[in-house]
Amino acid sequence: MAAITSSSANSRIAGVSEPVASVAGGSDLTIFMAADHSPFAKNRTLRTDFWNLFDAAGRPSYSPPDSPTPKYGTSRSGFLQSAVQPFIRRRHRPMSKQPTREAVTGVQKMTPSEAFVETMVANGVTDIFGIMGSAFMDAMDIFAPAGIRLVPVVHEQGAAHMADGYARVSGRHGVVIGQNGPGISNCVTAIAAAYWAHSPVVMITPETGTMGMGLGGFQEANQLPMFQEFTKYQGHVNNPKRMAEYTARCFDRAISEMGPTQLNIPRDYFYGEITTEIPKPMRVERGAGGENSLNAAVELLATAKFPVILSGGGVVMGDAVEECKALAERLGAPVANGYLRNDSFPASHPLWAGPLGYQGSKAAMKLIAQADVVLALGSRMGPFGTLPQHGMDYWPKEAKIIQVEADHTNLGLVKKITVGIHGDAKATAKALLERLAAKTLACDATKAERAAKIKAEKEAWEKELDAWTHERDQFSLDVIEEAKGEKTPTGGTYLHPRQVLRELEKAMPPRVMVSTDIGNINAVSNSYLRFEEPRSFFAPMSFGNCGYSLPTMIGAKCAAPDRPAVAYAGDGAWGMSMVEIMTAVRHDIPVTAVVFHNRQWGAEKKNQVDFYNRRFVAGELESESFAGIAKAMGAEGIVVDRLEDVGPALKKAIDLQMNQRKTCVIEIMCTRELGDPFRRDALSKPVRFLDKYKDYV
């Protein structure tokens, strides 16, 4: 691909006086930035001009004739205060810093706020996501000297998603906090998503003061029931003296049970004087499982003729990718990724077969259909990950299933199993390898034959993806035909989503992290997202909420600032969380967002196509330019309406992110064609009995 360079070609977007970039080497590619028609544009120019008054050292470089010496000296902050004193205050006062990040030891006198903060220090907390509030202000006041950064967000749902993303990429706690009442209720949806992703998120929920409980006061709410379905543990501080105890337990349980916990604190319990000791973190070491179940699994694997491994989220969370690889190589077994766990096995490995489940890999499905033994390593084998797809009911009903799960309640929950192992994916894989080492396996004799079959199935699937340029159902063919003469607002053409996804796949940088939202095009992307290392792919899992991808990726970027970060979203889901672009810009957390602008709620509209005779109700979306909105929020914006621009646009945005620390939104104009629905048995054909509705069938 040719390098992106500056260009003097004319832009096709009205209001843009200067082009952004083009590709050298004979191509006339132009990447167009959205025009900034924001009412804030003028103010932004004034702000830029104002800062131009300073020299490199921060001193005023210009003063009006006979201007007095600035009241607060010649530093930048002093000049600002003298110039605009009525309108701004100093952002913070000087604060002392802790010499180390170690928590205090031994029994000591402290305030409950100090006990709370010191317990977080003991657990290695460096970042918290939320919106400031009076309910926890006493603790918040000492976050900075404790070495803890509060990342202020636009909406608390975004904060909880950020904590989820932070936890999923780092393997450490993600922490979210908010004001009691509405600030806490705003987090419910995101905590539910974290629950289904098994993310160790600690939700800190300051509550109404104890003397006001039950009186229906301002922002009062019963906050524990809100989260009871989506937490592994809920701790309520019932005495300020127990602040450190409950805080520590919430952090311990989030890691040991791999899921969100809630710490509920009456707001008056942050104050006072207590004598306490900061507990040391307690970590539970998971084992490999029982001897009987391990031996039974080994016997099944030793006699298997066509073993297949299903690598799930437990492999990622247990840092077990290397052990999974070793086990696959010992067996010569193809490895399918669990649903939305595309980072659980490296895509470059010869035994990798791709993801199972909705919009997954045909190669993986065809291979697992031949299995006589399936080892589900760290996978709950959820419904979406095993449902029929591409016209294939591929799950091997006669195969012997070995399921390895850290959560014993998931064993045999969805699919019938032969052997269940309650164990850690890493420890179990090691134990199985040790037991298999001295054995002659029935599958040894056919390793080469199966390797050739794996290679052939993957090559066939890649060729099919290359040729699968657009959807082929009648509705999609109709809208493609209609779009032939239709121009985008910038004068280009609407692009086929599958071709777009293929081009994005080719342009992905090494070590990239990708989050996907819920929706039709995002679902189709499952076949095009491949990764080489774990903790790289984040999706809303079984909860399936919109507005997930952007804030989750902001949190992931906080945890891994050296890795490229890309969020996918459709235009419907994008509208729910795009305000967090302001969070990324304000706090210098650069990410890249790709918005598929197909002007509809695609996933649900597909049901109206299949079941309701194309009677479209509330599914159409006519939006302003998302790239333009991004510009108004201080980010960069790129509109893409030519296929050859897709890859260069992503590369340009990644360059902006990694080298200039800029957030960028790539708005890709897509046709209205639709991929297969999530499941075909989710609805039924309508039946009407009343005459006035008889035509609505």
PLM ranges: what are they?
Residues 1-17, 22, 27-30, 38, ...:
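Low-acidity, Ser/Thr- and Arg-rich intrinsically disordered low-complexity segments
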Residues 79-94:
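Short, Lys/Arg-enriched N-terminal segments with co-localized hydrophobic residues
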Residues 96-445, 507-510, 590-593, 630:
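N-terminal alpha/beta PP-like core and its mobile active-site loop of ThDP/TPP-dependent enzymes
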Residues 113-116, 131, 139-141, 459-551, ...:
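Active-site diphosphate/adenylate-binding microenvironment
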Residues 204, 213-214, 218-219, 412-414, ...:
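Thiamine diphosphate
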Residues 253, 435-472:
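Long, well-ordered, tryptophan-enriched scaffold segments
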